[in-house]
Regions:
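S-adenosyl-L-methionine-dependent methyltransferase catalytic module, highlighting the catalytic core
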Residues: 10-25, 51, 83, 111-123, ...
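A short His-aromatic
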Residues: 105-109
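Conserved N-terminal segment of class I S-adenosyl-L-methionine
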Residues: 1-94, 100-104, 117, 176, ...
Length: 230
């Protein structure tokens, strides 16, 4: 029997990481950017507290979640959640069931991320879309292992290759700032994030979301399961 404490309780508790409006904004942005249709069936792998998943549902998608923690059911009991350890088990859904598979800050937590990526491919329908966010090792290497649960870092190149090896097509990987104003006005604010990243001392990160998320850059990958799989 596993007597370890729930990772959400330790790392993502509301004292250290209060609930905010950001997850709903992120879900809405991704729905708009990738033209995800209302009524599409989405699976979030590693949904944590369920905030982004709830954002997708509120945006009109049919959302399901899977995680090692039952925390989503505490915050959003109406959301269908399946609890399992994906380091050891398959995603507990049938082949080709979902139009969209989404994950954020997930694949870096696995010693063998190729296994979970293969499972994401399996549960996507042909033509379905994968969206995955993970820290950019090139700019986060100093802080990456501050999270004890991090296992495998990714660069844009290694993330792209992982998806291509697992038969995804139309693979795109780009740097992504977790700042909604940058999504809305990239030509104005993207250069300012770069200036902040290079000039602001790290000691100020806890005191400014702008400084923190100018420095803590994510990789955003999108990919498609081909209509005819090999």
């Amino acid at each position: 029997m596993n007597s370890n404490r729930d990772y959400v309780e330790v790392i993502y508790n509301e004292t250290d990481r209060p609930l905010t409006s950001y997850p709903a904004k992120l879900a809405s942005h991704l729905v708009e950017r990738y033209e995800l249709s209302e009524g599409s069936r989405l699976l979030e792998v590693g949904c944590g507290r369920g905030e982004v998943l709830k954002g997708f549902i509120d945006a009109g998608l049919i959302g399901n979640g899977v995680d090692i923690s039952p925390a989503t059911s505490h915050y959003y009991p109406e959301v269908e959640l399946k609890v399992t350890n994906l380091e050891q088990n398959q995603i507990p859904y049938d082949d080709g069931l979902f139009d969209v598979v989404y994950s954020k800050s997930l694949i870096e937590h696995f010693y063998h991320p190729e296994r979970v990526v293969g499972e994401m491919f399996r549960v996507l329908r042909p033509g379905g879309v994968l969206l995955a966010l993970t820290p950019d090792w090139d700019v986060n290497y100093r802080m990456f292992y501050c999270d004890y649960t991090h296992r495998t870092p990714f660069t844009a190149e290694s993330l792209r290759d992982l998806l291509l090896i697992h038969r995804f097509t139309d693979v795109s990987v780009e740097r992504f700032r977790q700042l909604p104003v940058v999504w809305k006005y990239p030509k104005v604010f993207l250069p300012l994030t770069e200036l902040t990243r290079w000039t602001s001392p790290r000691v100020l990160k806890p005191h400014s979301k702008w400084i923190r998320f100018s420095k803590e850059i994510m990789l955003l990958a999108s990919a498609v399961k081909p209509l005819i799989s090999d």
